[in-house]
Amino acid sequence: MYRIGDEELEEIKKVLQSKQLLRYGDPSRGHLQEVVNFEREWAEKIGSGYALLMSGGGTSALASALIGLDIGPGDEVIVPGYTFIATASAVLNAGAIPVIAEIDETLTLDPEDFEKKITPNTKAVIPVHMQGLPADMDRIAGIAKKHNIK
């Protein structure tokens, strides 16, 4: 088990003082550099290929998932037209383009419209389950697999 010492505490302090605790935005911009540096150094320290700072919320989880899938500028991510703002904002924060697809009678992503919205730049889809109703994941996953979409 790895123990956190003075060196690690100093690095954490730098991140906290940067007032940028999460990886939102363009990591090449100065205000995110402490976060990016900490993530890289922490990953090396624990022997991992990557590490991401995040809060425990769903917005951060979406952002982290997109980063983990290597979604970035120029990529398109299909999202349902009826969802919480975090779905599209996570895509924007990754530098990608949210493409809004219609919903069906269950208020979730319409699989047919999802397939119509696919372009060569489409890299991912974020289905959202709404008001206790699940999206048609069998159809959505089948379409995604057919078009090599994450």
Predicted features and spans:
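Conserved PLP-binding active-site segment in aminotransferase class I/II-type PLP enzymes
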Residues: 1-59, 63-68, 72, 145-147
